[in-house]
Each structure stands twice: as C-alpha cells, then as structure tokens.
Amino acid sequence: MRRVVVTGMGAVTPIGIGVDTFWENVKKKTLGFGEITRFDTTDYKVHIAAEVKDFAGKDYMDFKAAKRMELFCQYAVAAAKEAFVQAGLDMEKEDPFRVGCSIGSGIGSLQAAETACHKIAEKGPSRVNPLMVPLMISNMAAGNVSIQLGLKGKSLNVVTACATGTHSIGEAYRSIQCGDADVMLAGGTEASICPVGVAGFTALTALSTVDDPEKCSLPFDKNRSGFVMGEGSGVVVLEELEHARQRGAKILAEVVGYGATSDAYHITSPAEDGSGAAKAMELALEEAGVKKEELMYINAHGTATHHNDLFETRAIKKLFGEHAYEMKVNSTKSMVGHLLGAAGAVEFITCVKEIEDGFIHATAGYTTPDEEMDLNYVAGDGVEENLEYALSNSLGFGGHNASILVKKWDI
C-alpha cells in the first residue's frame, strides 16, 4: 500500500481562524464560549455556544461566490485554501484528475431550510430561493472547495454525524493508499448554530444548559453537563509520499492507521461497553503495526455528555487494559465545543501540532474526577512530551466510530 503524508492544514475555529492562531490559543487554554449572537435565545434553555468570530466569506473568495454559499461552505473553502497554500500545491503542475476532495458536513445548512420555510409561510412556495437546495445540501462543501481550487479527482461527502471529519480524512487516506488519487484535500465543516439546530440538540438533552463559559464544557469531569455547540472547519492536504517528495513539499506528519466500526446499538448513545470504539482504535493500531504499549496519547471524542465520556473511557480501558493508566487522554472540545461534522478534522490537526511541538494540551476545566473515569485526562496546563504517535477518536450518532493514527515525521 502507498504511504500517505500530511503536507498542509487549515482551520476555522471558535478560538482562531488559521492553524497557527488556533494552536497558540489551544496551548493557552483559551475558551471559545460565549452568549449566542446569531439569534435571540430568550425562549431557549441554552444560551451559550462556541461561535466563530470575525469571519467574512469575501475575505477568502470573491463576493459573488460567497453569496452562493452558506456559512458551512464558506468555512470549508477558507480552511481548504489555507491548507492548499501551506502545501505549496500548483494545479498547473498537477494532473487535476489525480487531486481530489473528501470534505463532509454532518448537517449542511439548516439555515437555508429555515429561510425557505419562513418564505413559504409568508409568501408562498413560488418565492423560495431557486438556489435553496444547492445552498442546503451537505455535499456542497466538497463541491465548492473543488470548484474554487480546480480539483477534478474523486470528490466525496462523508456524513457520519459527529464522526464526519475523521471518516472524511480516513477515506481520503484510503483513496491515496489504493491509488485512486495522489492528493486529497480532506476534512469537515459545520455551521449549525441557528434556531432549529440549537432547539433540536436541546430537545435531545445533549447540550449543556450552564451559562458560565468556564463551566459549560467539562469533558470527563464529574460535573459535566452536556456539550456546547461549536462551528468551524478543518481541512488537511493528504498526499502520497513519493509525490510529496518529488515536488519538495514539507511533510508535517504521516497517517499510518485508520479504523472504522459501527456499534449497531442505539441512534444517539455509544455502546455502553465501548466495544465498537475499542475495535476502531484496535484496527488503526493493527494497520500501522503499532503495539498498544507504544501509544501514549489519545485525542478523545470527549464531548462532555454523561454517556459519551464514560463509554469512551470504557473503550480505552477495554482495549489497552492496564496500559490505559500510562496514557494521556484529552479533549479539544473543552475549549472549542463540539464542532459536529468538523470536530474530527480540527482534532486531527491538533494531533499533528501536538506531535510537531511535543506538547499535549490540557483538558480545560477538568478538576473533579468521576467514578470509573480514572484515566489521566491532562488537568492543569498541558504537558511537554515527545510523541511518536497520536490517535484521534470520533464517535457519531448512529453508532459511527472512527479512529485515525498519526505518526511523527522524522525521516
């Protein structure tokens, strides 16, 4: 199988636009939570979200293109262009049919549907925006990135709820391994902080109703109360190793393993024994030929819901046994909230930066251990540690599990 490396990364997040800004804020435990500004939450139980600040689509594409994209697509294009530039790709020197795209969104645009429903109620169905459907559907993130950058290879839209970003990167990795592409832009995007989105997740009792930004998102903590909705995008450039070497690209890391399973258990809850997530992690390690004792760090799904954090902890213990207590496990969602379809992609980027810098970020806000959840969740200010590998987990509604293993590039 062909080897696959990372040569570019881009991010739009609640704590910074651009990977460098995002990463500096992660290291400082900057919190991205605040009062929802997109709509009036007076009648809602939830008033806090992790919104992207100071973003304007026209800064990343021409005004006409931006007008024909919903926010989730604009975020994806912005992140993709950053990754594309860092990778130093020149499409005039590439076969465009060998450069593809695997960018998913868990939801697409609820806002486009909201607007259409209001229009029908107020003025009738004939007044709906002719572009309503292409504005709304989730595959348009991959479509618009391909259009903006001239990518004519395989174009995928993975939709696996909260595991979308990780599956998107994993499937891009597979595409390059198997020879379907030489380069893939891969990741996830989401922008669902809107009346229907917040109401829906609130009705599920999945969201924290805590209004204190310092206490609303507490992954693995005894006082956790649900996740905080976030938004943004993460996109990476994956590339076949020899292709990257031939064009003199700077290699940031290598992707060496990918595991994907289904719990076949429940539409929202992970399997209570963690068996599905454990198997996904095991598959990623087995593909890479990495022994369990060689892995010292996991970037967990860590949503701060009661079920996820407990069952994910069980999954880690199930696979690693006593070695689980030697590892460090953290949650980036403690700072940016849950980016839904973009979560796994932004957390993949976090893993690459942690390996590059030799620094494992803290789980912000973690202070009070819970029964049975007794692993090292990285309290305090983070730790300096030379990492050879980082494993990123994502668990999505419907029982979708994905794990992807990143290796330090030192050749």
List each language-model region with its residue ranges:
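ACP-dependent fatty acid/polyketide chain-elongation machinery
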Residues: M1-A65, E242-E254, I349-T363, K407-I411
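Acyl-CoA/ACP chain-elongation machinery
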Residues: T37, D180-S225, Y258-E272, A300-D309, ...
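Active-site-proximal alpha-helical scaffold in enzymes
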Residues: A76-L89, S138-A142, S146-E190, V228-A249, ...
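Phosphate/pyrophosphate-binding loops at sites that engage ATP/ADP/AMP, CoA/4′-phosphopantetheine
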Residues: A83-D95, A244-K250, M281-Y297, L319-H323
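Condensing-enzyme catalytic core mediating Claisen C-C bond formation in acyl metabolism
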Residues: R3-T7, G34, D212-A288, Y297, ...
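Conserved beta-ketoacyl condensing-enzyme motif
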Residues: V6, T21, K27-T160, T189-V198, ...
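Conserved small-residue
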Residues: G8, V26, A80, C101, ...
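Glycine-/small-residue-rich "gating" segment that lines the acyl/pantetheine channel
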Residues: E122-N129, H167-G170, R174, E190-Q246, ...
